[in-house]
Structure formats: C-alpha cells, structure tokens
C-alpha cells in the first residue's frame, strides 16, 4: 500500500498541469472534478475501509477533558477559517468562487484519503505489533503531510512554504485525532475543505509570506501540543481497553 501511496501522491501533486490543458475556467474545473473522482475511487478501493476500529471507541475521562481544551483553544482558529472566506468571496466573480470550491473539494477529499486514509492505514499495518501504533502512525503521517507541502517551493518563497509545512503538520495531527474520534474520514474531509476554501488557494503563493516563521510557529504551538496530547491519550485508552 505504501507504493500505491507514493504513486498516487505524485499523480495528485501534478494536478496543476491540468490547468494548462485549457484556458476556459469551466473546462479546467471539469477536468479537476474528473481527476478527483478517479483518484478518490482508486484510494477508496486501496483503503478498503474508512474506519480505524471495528466500533467507535468511547473516550476516557482524561481524554474528554483534553479534547474540550483543544476545542476551546481551537475556537478562534475555527471562527477565522469560517468567517474569512465569507468576508472575501462577496467581492469575487462567480467563476472564481466555483473554482475555489472545486480546488478546495479536491484537496479535502484526495489529501484526506491519501494521508489520513491510505498512508495511515499502511502505517498501522506496519506497526501492528507496537502498542503505540496509533500515536506513531498519526505522527508520521502528519510529518509527511507537512513535508508534502514542500513541493510548493516550485512556485512560492521558502518562508511561505516552511510556514505552510508547520501549519500542515499541526492540522494533520488534529485531522488524525478527528478520524480516530469519529472512526470515519468524512468529517476530516469536511474540516479540510473549509480550511482550504479561501481565495488564496487560487493564487501561486498559498503560504504565510507576510508573517514571520516564529509567529507562525507560536500561533499553532498550543494546538500542536494539545493535539499530540489528545492523540497520546487516545492511544493509551485504546491500549488499556484492549488488554
């Protein structure tokens, strides 16, 4: 499955080439939709299941407390993610909004099936005999998810890209935890879509070029730490439950 992950990730990374096949925006969007459907079908077949566990596991007391802390700390981020696009799209042409929707949908579906789906499942199988496999697989998949954004160095500055890697790693841990909590990948796709559904996704520089890396790191550090704690607590509770 790891070989399939690498091959499909490379194919997905080359999706911008599709935009050069036509100058008509609706043809470009249609081609992206077709690519999304094809890749999603292949990934769903390779993943075999969107579940992690046979049945959804109930959270332990400590995990519930830390999950609420993560949610409370994350509320400002959630509000900014939801409100920023609404404020901006009111001044955008309808074709730009449609293109933004299509690209965000592709990213939400394909990147989740790649990293929280195929890669995460593959790592769980690889570390099957390790009691901390949920934690290890979650961290590795999040690191690789962050590193995947290094491909943006081909069209944007180093500072923007590194900031994007830091943010993507943090987001990856949260999305892994969400998949474990829900025992499904659909909610990960929904959250990922809203994170990417913003005008900047249509530009060549999708990173944080006007914000210092120190500020980016400090901004996401609380979420990063809390998400890792929650992931560790979930893994610990899983081990205790399945002794």
Language-model segments: which ranges?
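Helix-boundary and loop/linker segments of multi-pass membrane transporters
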Residues: 59-62, 88-98, 130-131
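Membrane-interface helix/loop boundary segments of multi-pass membrane proteins
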Residues: 113-140, 157, 180-184
């Amino acid at each position: 499955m790891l070989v399939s992950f690498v091959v499909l990730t490379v194919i997905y990374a080359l999706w911008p080439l599709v935009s050069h096949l036509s100058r008509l925006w609706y043809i470009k969007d249609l081609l992206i939709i077709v690519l999304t459907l094809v890749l999603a079908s292949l990934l769903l077949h390779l993943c075999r299941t969107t579940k992690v566990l046979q049945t959804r596991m109930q959270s332990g007391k400590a995990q519930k407390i830390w999950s609420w802390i993560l949610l409370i700390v994350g509320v400002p981020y959630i509000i900014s993610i939801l409100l920023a696009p609404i404020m901006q799209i009111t001044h955008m042409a309808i074709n730009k909004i449609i293109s933004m929707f299509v690209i965000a949908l592709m990213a939400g579906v394909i990147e989740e099936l790649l990293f929280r789906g195929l890669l995460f499942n593959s790592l769980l199988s690889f570390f099957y005999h390790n009691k901390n496999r949920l934690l290890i697989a979650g961290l590795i998949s999040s690191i690789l998810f962050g590193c995947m954004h290094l491909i943006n160095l081909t069209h944007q500055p180093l500072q923007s890209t590194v900031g994007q890697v830091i943010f993507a790693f943090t987001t990856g841990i949260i999305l892994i935890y969400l998949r474990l909590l829900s025992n499904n990948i659909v909610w990960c796709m929904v959250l990922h879509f809203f994170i990417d559904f913003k005008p900047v996704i249509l530009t060549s520089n999708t990173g944080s070029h006007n914000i210092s890396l120190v500020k980016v790191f400090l901004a996401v550090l609380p979420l990063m730490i809390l998400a890792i704690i929650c992931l560790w607590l979930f893994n610990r509770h899983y081990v205790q439950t399945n002794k």
